[in-house]
């Protein structure tokens, strides 16, 4: 049960079962991809009674409310690795022995292209309207461009409508806003796990909403299955488990392409998940923040907005942002597309606290309307660089005999290091993570994504070759000094793009 922190709960050695409700927020990150960093000897705080002001913290401040203490606890529990990295960040000239960051999912490959485009004269206009309060949904000129952009790149059957667009400062705010307007305090969303762990905080810190994990595993049971595959049967089991524990589930979160797996849901799978949600009157939030970062054409990505007929359009809400696809995680632009006017209006009300400046809105409109630059310059070069970086890292992993999951989308490879754990526990996983950090390379460990199998790590490859080379060299040094179990993972767990999987 996902509840408020209480004192002195030590890390468990195994995840709950496949229909369990999330029990640990262990190191979920702070919404800026810092999900890989809790101290291994830090005691976890037992969660109980979501929203219960009587919940106790092992260390609370006399200056904070109980809610404030919980919020501070999330920050404190997820900062160590990221803070360590920033105190000793690698710099080729100033700090060549510093930490290489292969843990934060950012695209660092195309700054040259972005810098030139964002510095052009058409980006620098200032008008009185841009310095005044906007429509909180976003300026109409931006919402019109977002609708045209999504219509084109999501391949929607009919043009999308600007009145269904809401603009916020990133997908973290969108998750938070949707959780707040769709759920009562203590209600929950289903989410396939492993998943991007910062979503835990996005839906909880304001909305007081839980996550019910639909736990996936690496086992492959036949020719038509793949590692960590989501099925309707698993969704049904998780929903039944939540109901049996008295937890009201209001929605389903899907990330497509998936983070941390890099997996892609086929149109048939998406249709099945949406029909499951309709049967149970669940909202579906689809995060498509990596939709233009599919660098293998054979991966066969399709947006949910490309489906001819949504089973329940009033409960289907789609998110996208520029942080990943355009390498602008510091610029903070995200958008919601929903046909539900009540949901759009409620989320827009929260844009008072999560809106964009008029100048940023203008720049985003200019960028999104420039299809010539996007199609002829940026996307081809970005995909080529992502593919080259992925090839470099995957070849290193093969040389080390390390299985991995990767389907040609996103910035990361899901790496199987289970054979390097003396015991199959999350304590050993964190100890291995710390050895990487001590050897000046930062990765993200599986428990940060609520993976139920100890020993999986997310490795980000979307960086320059010289940093990848040094980072992989440091990974190799750690693993070569680590004893291995006699039997590694079976070869069928290596999953790479070889054509559509459906």
Curated annotation (Swiss-Prot):
Keyword Protein transport included in the entry's annotation: no
Keywords attached to this entry: Pyridoxal phosphate
GO molecular function: pyridoxal phosphate binding; transaminase activity
Annotated segments matching region Disordered: 15-35
Binding annotation for substrate: 106
Residue positions where N6-(pyridoxal phosphate)lysine is found in the record: 324
Cell cycle listed as a keyword: no
Stored InterPro entries: Aminotransferase_I/II_large, Ethylene_sulfur-biosynth, PyrdxlP-dep_Trfase, PyrdxlP-dep_Trfase_major, PyrdxlP-dep_Trfase_small
Residue ranges that the Swiss-Prot or TrEMBL entry lists as coiled coil: none
GO biological process: amino acid metabolic process; biosynthetic process
One Pfam assignment: Aminotran_1_2
PANTHER family: 1-AMINOCYCLOPROPANE-1-CARBOXYLATE SYNTHASE-LIKE PROTEIN 1 (PTHR43795:SF17), BIFUNCTIONAL ASPARTATE AMINOTRANSFERASE AND GLUTAMATE/ASPARTATE-PREPHENATE AMINOTRANSFERASE-RELATED (PTHR43795)
Function summary: Does not catalyze the synthesis of 1-aminocyclopropane-1-carboxylate but is capable of catalyzing the deamination of L-vinylglycine.
Similarity-based family: Belongs to the class-I pyridoxal-phosphate-dependent aminotransferase family.
Protein name: 1-aminocyclopropane-1-carboxylate synthase-like protein 1
Annotated organism of origin: Bos taurus
């Amino acid at each position: 049960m996902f509840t408020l922190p209480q004192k002195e709960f030590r890390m468990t050695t195994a995840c709950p079962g496949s229909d369990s409700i999330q029990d640990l927020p262990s190191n979920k990150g702070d919404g800026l991809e810092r999900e890989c960093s809790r101290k291994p000897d830090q005691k976890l705080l037992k969660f109980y009674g979501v929203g219960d002001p009587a919940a106790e913290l092992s260390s609370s401040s006399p200056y904070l409310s109980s809610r404030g203490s919980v919020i501070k606890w999330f920050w404190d529990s997820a900062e160590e690795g990221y803070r360590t990295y920033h105190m000793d960040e690698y710099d080729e000239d100033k700090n060549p022995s510093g930490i290489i960051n292969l843990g934060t999912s950012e695209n660092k490959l195309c700054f040259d292209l972005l810098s030139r485009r964002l510095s052009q004269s058409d980006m620098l206009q200032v008008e009185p309207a841009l310095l005044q309060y906007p429509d909180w949904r976003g300026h109409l000129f931006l919402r019109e461009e977002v609708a045209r952009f999504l219509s084109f790149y999501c391949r929607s059957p009919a043009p999308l409508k600007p009145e269904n667009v809401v603009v916020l400062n990133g997908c973290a705010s969108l998750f938070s806003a949707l959780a707040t307007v769709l759920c009562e305090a203590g209600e929950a969303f289903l989410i396939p796990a492993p998943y991007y762990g910062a979503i835990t905080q996005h839906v909880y810190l304001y909305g007081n909403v839980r996550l019910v994990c639909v736990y996936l595993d690496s086992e492959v049971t036949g020719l038509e299955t793949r590692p960590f595959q989501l099925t309707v049967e698993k969704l049904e089991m998780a929903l039944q488990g939540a109901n049996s524990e008295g937890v009201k589930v209001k929605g389903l979160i899907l990330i497509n392409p998936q983070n941390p797996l890099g997996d892609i849901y086929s149109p048939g799978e998406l249709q099945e998940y949406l029909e499951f949600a309709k049967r149970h009157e669940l909202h579906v939030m689809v995060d498509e923040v990596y939709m233009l970062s599919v660098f293998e054409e054979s991966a066969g990505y399709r947006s949910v907005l490309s489906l001819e007929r949504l089973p329940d359009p009033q409960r289907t809400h789609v998110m996208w942002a520029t942080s990943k696809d355009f390498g602008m995680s510091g610029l903070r632009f995200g958008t919601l597309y929903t046909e539900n006017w009540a949901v759009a209006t409620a989320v827009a009300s929260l844009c008072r606290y999560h809106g964009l400046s008029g100048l940023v809105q203008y720049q985003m409109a200019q960028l999104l309307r420039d299809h010539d630059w996007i199609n002829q310059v940026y996307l081809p070069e970005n995909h080529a660089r992502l593919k080259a970086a992925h090839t470099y890292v995957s070849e290193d992993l093969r040389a080390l005999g390390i299985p991995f999951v990767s389907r040609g989308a996103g910035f990361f490879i899901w790496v199987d290091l289970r054979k390097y754990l003396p015991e199959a526990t999350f304590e050993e996983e964190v100890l291995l993570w710390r050895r990487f950090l001590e050897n000046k390379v930062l990765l993200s460990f599986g428990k940060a994504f609520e993976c139920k199998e100890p020993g999986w790590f997310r490795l980000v490859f979307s960086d320059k070759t010289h940093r990848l080379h040094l980072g992989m060299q440091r990974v190799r040094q750690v693993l070569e000094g680590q004893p291995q179990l006699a039997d590694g993972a079976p070869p069928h767990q290596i999953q790479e793009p070889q054509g559509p999987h459906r």
